[in-house]
Design a protein with these regions (language model features):
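Conserved, mostly hydrophobic/aromatic
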Residues: 2, 10, 72, 136, ...
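Catalytic cores of alpha/beta
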Residues: 50, 55-68, 132, 163-166, ...
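Internal alpha/beta core interface subdomains
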Residues: 9, 130-147, 153-170, 186
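Active-site beta-loop-alpha junctions enriched in small/polar residues
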Residues: 15-17, 51-57, 77-79, 113-119, ...
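Glycine-rich, proline-tolerant flexible connector loops at the mouths of alpha/beta enzymes
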Residues: 6-32, 79-86, 141-157, 201-203
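Hydrophobic faces of well-ordered beta-strands that scaffold small-molecule active sites
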Residues: 10-12, 48-52, 72-74, 108-114, ...
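Conserved anion-binding
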Residues: 58, 63-143
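Alpha-helix-loop-beta-strand connector modules within alpha/beta enzyme cores
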Residues: 21-50, 90-112, 155-178, 211-223
Length: 223
């Protein structure tokens, strides 16, 4: 449906797999993610991404490589945080990039959330968005993602502008995007990740709504 509507890429995510596990997930999740991702890869001709919650970046990279996906969305790639799943005490960049090279998956791009949603960031409170983006760039990400505090929350316009000015990496807006905000966001950001706004009543846990999908496509064309 999304590919037919004209979307540039799609992202597979175990969003309904509540409550999320922190960093390490079981073989049943890896297996299900592989089957689902491969089915999407086979069904569309646009790039396919994958995120395995919460912060299971090694597993996501493995699945993306095996299933033929193109990129992964990561949490905790650089810097620590305290999230609803627990403490993300160690940044993942060093081990993850070495693992990517080891399995021959250098073609898989890494999109990194700069500040994990549903998390406290007191550990990095003395760092600006520009600092975090610069550090994430230095750590080896291929793109950075700016979000609001929770799923469906709009990202701060100031944060997006600061991120875009801080690094040559593509800046993606990763939450709270809707048909009204989309044109303005695309004047600053390289792209957006749209989830809740595509669903019935704007709720992430509902089914896709063809009318909402059409409004997003129209907003992008008008922007």
């Amino acid at each position: 449906m999304l590919a037919d509507a004209g979307f540039d890429a799609v992202l597979v995510e175990n969003m309904h797999d509540l409550p999320y596990l922190r960093r390490t997930v079981g073989p049943e999740i890896v297996a299900a993610a592989t089957v689902a991702t491969r089915a999407v890869v086979d069904a569309v001709s646009i790039p396919v991404g994958l995120q395995i919650l919460a912060g299971a970046n090694h597993e996501a990279l493995s699945v993306a490589h095996a299933a033929g996906a193109d990129f992964i969305r990561t949490e905790g790639f650089a810097y620590a945080s305290v999230a609803d799943e627990g403490i993300f005490a160690e940044a993942d960049a060093g081990p993850l990039l070495r693992f990517r090279r080891m399995i021959g998956a250098d073609r898989i791009a890494i999109w990194a959330d700069v500040r994990k949603k549903h998390a406290a960031h007191a550990l990095t409170a003395d760092l600006s968005i520009a600092d975090l983006v610069s550090g994430t760039h230095f750590a080896g990400a291929d793109a950075v993602i700016i979000t609001g505090a929770h799923t469906g929350d709009a990202a701060s316009a100031a944060d997006i502008e600061e991120a875009a000015a801080a690094s040559p990496l593509p800046v993606m807006v990763g939450s709270g995007v809707d048909a009204t905000s989309l044109p303005g966001l695309l004047r600053v950001a390289s792209g957006v990740i749209v989830g809740s706004a595509l669903k019935v009543d704007g709720r992430w846990d509902n089914e896709l709504d063809p009318e909402r999908i059409a409004r997003i496509v129209e907003a992008r064309a008008g922007g």
